[in-house]
């Protein structure tokens, strides 16, 4: 059952975890050391004191700002939006989903092609999970992997807002709290957000709405077929997920208050 990807929503992540048994641990350790050094190098070269985190909610479509005032961090399928990329010229891309990014679907394949484009056009720095290194090592060419930093997850109660000091993240179920906040907190004192709309609590048929410009809508049915177990979730699941997400965001906001970080959303949000 644990690897039955047609019935079990956790099967894809289980299969990824199994893939770690087929790679040299010394290789992984070298990659982690390189990734940690890369983060410190990035920190030493930062010239702007504030960062803009961009989510894929509908509010990002009408967002108007002078991107040149910020270092820009994007996530997930925003990589498909070439017009937005041309304006924002993102410095960072974060992703870490077990099916949409390292998976065998055409959706994941198109996503990875867009990651290649992003690196070629903007030399964007990529942060993702060390969990997925064994897969990405085999699907990305070395010239692209040079822009990757792989971050390990650690089972801990505390959220880590300083990866320069301790290079790990606490596992969470959303890219904002999994990677975007940890990296942003580690490098910047002023953090502004756009496109993290969330949802009204009664709108519980899915996680939340996404901007059509930032989603591979034409490939969704294919990935739902391949990973059918992943999508066997009911309203109760989405309610619990959303409540957990709100609580996790609150914990990060609390951390900002004790670490002198400024956080604010520039677009309408049910989360902030």
What does each model-found stretch correspond to?
Residues 1-272:
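Metal-ion/cofactor- or nucleotide/acyl-coenzyme-handling active-site neighborhoods
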């Amino acid at each position: 059952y644990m690897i039955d990807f047609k019935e079990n929503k956790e099967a894809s992540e289980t299969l990824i975890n199994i893939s770690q048994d087929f790679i040299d641990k010394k290789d992984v350790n070298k990659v982690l050391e390189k990734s940690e050094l890369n983060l410190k190098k990035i920190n030493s070269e930062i010239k702007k004191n504030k960062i803009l985190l961009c989510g894929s909610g509908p509010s990002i479509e009408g967002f108007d700002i002078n991107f040149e005032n910020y270092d820009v961090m994007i996530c997930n399928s925003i990589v498909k939006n070439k017009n937005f990329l041309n304006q924002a010229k993102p410095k960072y891309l974060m992703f870490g989903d077990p099916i949409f990014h390292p998976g065998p679907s055409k959706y994941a394949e198109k996503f990875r092609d867009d990651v290649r484009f992003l690196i070629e056009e903007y030399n964007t720095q990529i942060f993702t999970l060390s969990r997925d290194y064994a897969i990405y090592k085999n699907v990305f060419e070395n010239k692209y992997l040079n822009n990757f930093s792989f971050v390990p997850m650690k089972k801990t109660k505390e959220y880590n807002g300083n990866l320069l000091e301790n290079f790990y993240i606490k596992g969470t179920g959303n890219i904002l709290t999994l990677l975007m906040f940890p990296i942003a907190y580690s490098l910047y004192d002023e953090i502004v957000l756009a496109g993290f709309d969330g949802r009204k609590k009664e709108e519980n048929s899915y996680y939340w709405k996404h901007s059509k410009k930032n989603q591979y809508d034409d490939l969704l049915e294919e990935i739902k077929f391949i990973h059918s177990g992943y999508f066997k979730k009911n309203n109760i699941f989405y309610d619990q997920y959303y409540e957990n997400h709100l609580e996790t965001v609150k914990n990060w906001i609390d951390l900002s208050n004790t670490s002198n970080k400024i956080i604010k959303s520039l677009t309408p949000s049910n989360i902030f």
